[in-house]
Every structure is written in C-alpha cells, then in structure tokens.
Amino acid sequence: MTQSLYQRLGSAEGIAAIVDDAVDRHAANQLLAPRFSGRDLPRAKQMATLFMCMGAGGPQKYDGRDMRTVHAGMNISEQELIATIDDFVAAMQEQGVGATEVNEVVAILYSLKGEVLRV
C-alpha cells in the first residue's frame, strides 16, 4: 500500500516540525518579516500545521478560515509567495524530507496562488 504524503512527511509530528521551522524562517526573512511582526506565531504555526496535515491527507480537520479570507487585504505579491515557498523548501530539506515529497508540497502551496495573491 502506498503511503500518503501525510505519512511520508512524518505525520503530524513531522509536519509540525516543518511548519515550525518554516514560520521561523518567514519571521526572519527580510521580505516576509514585516508580515509576521506582532502576530501570534504559536497560533499561526498551530493553524498552518492543521491546514498542512489535512492537505497532505492526514486525519486532522482544519476548521480555520479559508485561505482567501485569511489573506484578504494583505495584497501579497508573487515575490512574497515564492519567498514563502522557498522557506518551506528549506525547512523540509532541513528536516530530511525527500525530493519527491518536497516537490509535492511545492505544487500544493503554489496551487493556492489564486487564494492568496493580491486578495
């Protein structure tokens, strides 16, 4: 039986480690840091972990706001989206995630483009 992306990322624990690292990178990223200043980072990490777990095929239920609502009024640029994805790639590589899984996550994140850019 083929493992789900959720399982291949290390289930909830592995995904939480990826998200924790990625959000820390966002907060330190010169381009993204202003977006994270003053935010409740532990809450952002929790919600992003649930979202990513569900999106990767895990049993968790994300009951937060949809991506368009979360990003409404932020006027996020494509450059910021790419920087966000780059931070996730670096976090996954740091966690030892394989190239196939990294590519799958990148495709999922990029598929959200219409929900987060310039909304």
Model-based region annotation:
Residues 1-119:
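Core of compact, soluble alpha-helical bundle domains
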